[in-house]
Amino acid sequence: MGPTINCEPTKRGDLVKVTFSLVARNGNARVALVGDFNGWRQGANMFKRRGDTDVASVTLSAGRRYEFRYVDDDGTWFNDEGAHGYAPNEFGGDNSVVDLRDGFGKPDD
């Protein structure tokens, strides 16, 4: 199983719980979820190990798109293969995108 993004509306309706899941990295490597929703701070949203999967959840405002990436213990930044899209960043690469504008992040077919 590759990376997955699950988006669920909350009871408030204007917020969406977004859960990011990754195949657990080798050994005890830790992964951080970083993005425009947390100021790109590496310690703000850490993945938690659940069996052979690393999981992180954030609650975000519906109706917009967010850019994010993952960074592991050794400082390696990487994107989500299951992202809803990608956006160029100022470092010459791309950021992953989760799109909560319509349908709570379900990519177009």
What are these regions (language model features)?
Residues 1-14:
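N-terminal edge beta-strand
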Residues 11-65, 73-101:
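Aromatic-rich carbohydrate-binding modules that target alpha-glucans
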Residues 2-3, 98-109:
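Compositionally biased low-complexity segments at domain edges in trafficked proteins
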